[in-house]
């Protein structure tokens, strides 16, 4: 329960950016991975590793930190990370670029891809390969388990515009407003069928009660035409027809 009277900024510093909190998030994802990644029951057994996930976190430093923790604590999961160039560079930018380069090296080595670092735009080439892999698009659509990527860690990248029916869950270690929240949740909502994937899942690690209200508000906004705030939705005339 985080109802401690601390501001969101204080919670970020004292709790959410702490190593024990992040270790607990990794442990929770690891503990529930088989359930969230398994497909429908086939001959009495759930097929493992049929679905992928995304972990959305607060800023580049958190992306790099979580990636390192997954490598240490959950090496059996195939995890990749990315962040965009236009996210706040701030202090430690060179360290963060080095962390991204190392993650790219890990990825290229594990999957035996070409060397993206030799491309004109290495980050774009890496992101393109990663999104194809997690969406199981050509050439990763043959059901070859060696091609499988389990989890992508992001800050802002891929929270809009990207979706895949194979992304079954988004884990949220960040607070989002209603508009961005609907966008992020929509990354998981492409269904397969009523048995394999009837709906996507979202798991919140920050202020569950607050986020529950935000989800309710976001759904009101969404049903009233996709405004960015609840106030905007309230100003939408109801007599406009469907």
Residue ranges and their predicted role:
Residues 69-74, 94-104, 168-170, 185-189, ...:
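Short secondary-structure boundary/capping segments
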